[in-house]
UniProtKB/Swiss-Prot annotation:
Source organism of the structure: Mesorhizobium japonicum (strain LMG 29417 / CECT 9101 / MAFF 303099) (Mesorhizobium loti (strain MAFF 303099))
Protein name: DNA repair protein RecO
InterPro entries in the record: ARFGAP/RecO (IPR037278), DNA_rep/recomb_RecO_N (IPR022572), NA-bd_OB-fold (IPR012340), RecO (IPR003717), RecO_C (IPR042242)
Family assignment from sequence similarity: Belongs to the RecO family.
Coiled coil (residue ranges): none
Recorded GO CC terms: bacterial nucleoid
Upper taxonomic lineage: Bacteria, Pseudomonadati, Pseudomonadota, Alphaproteobacteria, Hyphomicrobiales
GO biological process: DNA recombination; double-strand break repair
Family matches, as Pfam families: RecO_C, RecO_N
Source species, domain of life: Bacteria
Primary role: Involved in DNA repair and RecF pathway recombination.
Record keywords, A-Z: DNA damage, DNA recombination, DNA repair
Length: 253
């Protein structure tokens, strides 16, 4: 068995004295693992870092075997990403979400989204919005996608302000007003075609929204905890926003 594909490295772990098990998200073969012989060498280690985009050759005697990878660098993103706590935790969060999907199942849309994320993840002002959108994509791929296109009660596409925790569908401000204390906030930037950027409060609302449905549909049924990286990502974002606010205050003074 043999195939060639490109992939983004999610992680590695040691195997024996000199080799490594490589975990990648590939364009056509989904999340895939393989053995890299000599993967702990000085030559290979810089290539096999999370966030790097690589050209992969996978070989195995049988399809169900772990197989071996040969990996060559296409884009060396790791050094840039490692300079940002937001980027490090963001990548770890997305990797944890991808592990919720069956190994070797192709998800081309997720690969394309991840490719975009890698380019912008070290921009802390954009990272929160990007990872929140990625979480919505993961929920959709898992079969628990939210319908944010129109009001569940009236069908209107205007002034959508809430999401029903029961149905996962958007609700307009007027229709949801009597139950607003029980509704989840729908940040405007998540609405298709809004063209709006996310402020810190909207980012918090977005992760509260996706976190609710991850807990209900994924974490609780599987008896697993939210990934630590997600909490680390949100903490890094809050620190970044607090620092920016403090700097802006000093400049204004």
């Amino acid at each position: 068995m043999e195939w060639r594909d490109e992939g983004i490295i999610l992680g590695t772990r040691k195997h024996g004295e000199t080799s490594a098990i490589l975990e990648v998200m590939t364009r056509a073969h989904g999340r895939h693992l393989g053995l890299v012989r000599g993967g702990r060498s000085r030559k290979q280690q810089p290539v096999l870092q999370p966030g790097n985009r690589v050209d992969l050759l996978w070989r195995a005697r049988l399809d169900e075997h772990l197989g071996t990878f040969q990996a060559e660098a296409i884009e060396m993103n790791a050094a840039r990403l490692m300079d940002s706590a937001v980027a490090v935790y963001g990548l770890q969060t997305m990797a944890a979400h991808l592990r919720l999907l069956p190994e070797r199942d192709a998800h081309g849309g997720l690969y394309e989204a991840l490719s975009v994320m890698i380019v912008h993840l070290d921009d802390a002002d954009a990272a929160g919005e990007l990872v929140a959108r990625f979480e919505l994509l993961i929920l959709d791929e898992l079969g628990f996608g939210l319908d944010l296109s129109q009001c569940a009660a009236t069908g209107t596409r205007q002034d959508l302000a809430y999401v029903s925790p029961k149905s996962g569908r958007a609700v307009s401000r007027e229709a949801g007003a009597p139950w607003r204390d029980k509704m989840l906030a729908l940040p405007a930037f998540l609405q298709r075609g809004s063209g709006l950027r996310a402020d810190p409060a909207a980012v918090e609302d977005a992760f509260r929204l996706t976190g609710f449905f991850f807990t209900r549909h994924v974490y609780e049924p599987r008896a697993i905890e939210q990934p630590d990286a997600r909490a680390g990502f949100l903490a890094a974002l809050r620190k970044h926003h607090a620092t920016r606010k403090a700097i802006a205050g000093d400049n204004a003074a």
